[in-house]
A protein has these predicted regions:
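Acidic/histidine-enriched alpha-helical segments
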Residues: 134, 139-140, 144
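Intrinsically disordered, low-complexity terminal/linker regions enriched in Pro/Ser/Gly
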Residues: 142-171
């Protein structure tokens, strides 16, 4: 039941066009019985030009693939990883064969999980933890989906002592 957004265009591999000029614009591909089913159906522009593809998880309507806004959604923490796949070599359509589009996803932002465990040096109950501080935790960012570069635009508030971020503010 996973779903990804797929975008495709022709022309320059390093510059995705505006929404209206894309060959595929946010086609939602859902994993169904081991196959990806696209809505709407993805079609090739022609069989001459190379087509370039980007896949994004979770699904997202992105108007500017070189500067897309991303906001961490605290209500969907289990789906909070941001994965991106780019097919920058380009593919051309061949009418005589099935044409799968290889997309290998990598994390550009990931959920942080902190599990504190203690041995018995503080007794069976363990210590009381007031806070856990984490550095460089982004709540919002601008993502260049073409290069997978993430630029934080908002970070969690610093702890009062100025060291790291209060985990409670992130989740």
């Amino acid at each position: 039941g996973d779903e990804i957004s797929v975008y495709a265009w022709t022309g320059d591999a390093t510059a995705a066009p505006e929404t209206r000029e894309r060959v595929v614009n946010n086609a939602i591909n859902k994993l169904t019985n081991g196959s990806w089913i696209s809505t709407p159906q993805m079609l090739w522009k022609n069989n001459r030009d190379k087509h370039y593809f980007i896949g994004v998880y979770p699904i997202s309507a992105i108007s500017d693939l070189s500067a897309g806004e991303y906001t961490f959604d605290v209500t969907k923490q289990t789906e909070s990883d941001l994965l991106v796949a780019i097919n920058k070599d380009g593919l051309s359509y061949n009418v005589d064969e099935q044409q799968p589009v290889p997309l290998t996803f990598t994390h550009v932002m990931a959920k942080l999980v902190v599990n504190l465990t203690y041995k018995n040096q503080w007794g069976t109950e363990g210590p009381t933890v007031d806070k856990v501080a984490v550095g460089n935790a982004a709540k919002k960012a601008t993502v260049n989906y073409l290069t997978k570069v993430v630029t934080p635009s908002a970070v969690a508030s610093l702890c009062p002592d100025g060291n790291g971020f209060d985990i409670g503010q992130l989740f």
